[in-house]
């Protein structure tokens, strides 16, 4: 979902097997068997995000903003969390930098969806709401630089 709860089909390179969405959760875990070998490489160097430039061109996303969320998880938002849908979703965010290895946290239990909703989503939303309260072009530039540093440090 992006601004004002609008759903859209996000552009990404295919990194998973066909019908992966029917084979597991909406989140991916570490060593997820639905991710192809080439897909693992593409994800590791974050090349899967490049097609999202089309989403920026089409007006569905911005370069920096809260990451788009799957509608399945938006239904768990508190009233305060819905504020993150006032701006277009971003290709990168402070939250995506901090949670770049989210898949490892999801391996901590038997139910990745439950871990995501109960533990990860509330933490992500703290950072997203902080961003909304104090966003600026300058901070967006810093987030883009920090993102590039994280990608090239891998």
Where on the chain are the PLM-derived regions?
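Conserved small/aromatic sequence motifs within transmembrane helices
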Residues: 1-154
């Amino acid at each position: 979902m992006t601004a004002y709860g609008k759903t859209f089909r996000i552009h990404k390179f295919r990194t998973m097997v066909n019908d992966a969405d029917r084979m597991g959760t909406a989140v991916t875990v570490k060593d997820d068997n639905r991710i192809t070998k080439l897909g693992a490489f593409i994800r590791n160097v974050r090349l899967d995000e490049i097609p999202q430039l089309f989403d920026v061109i089409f007006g569905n996303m911005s370069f920096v903003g809260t990451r788009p969320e799957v509608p399945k998880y938006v239904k768990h938002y508190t009233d305060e969390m819905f504020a993150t849908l006032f701006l277009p979703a971003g290709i990168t965010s402070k939250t995506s930098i901090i949670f770049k290895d989210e898949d490892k946290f999801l391996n901590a239990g038997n139910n990745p969806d439950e871990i995501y909703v109960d533990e990860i989503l509330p933490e992500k939303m703290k950072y997203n709401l902080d961003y909304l309260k104090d966003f600026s072009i300058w901070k967006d530039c810093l987030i883009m630089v920090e993102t590039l540093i994280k990608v090239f440090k891998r």
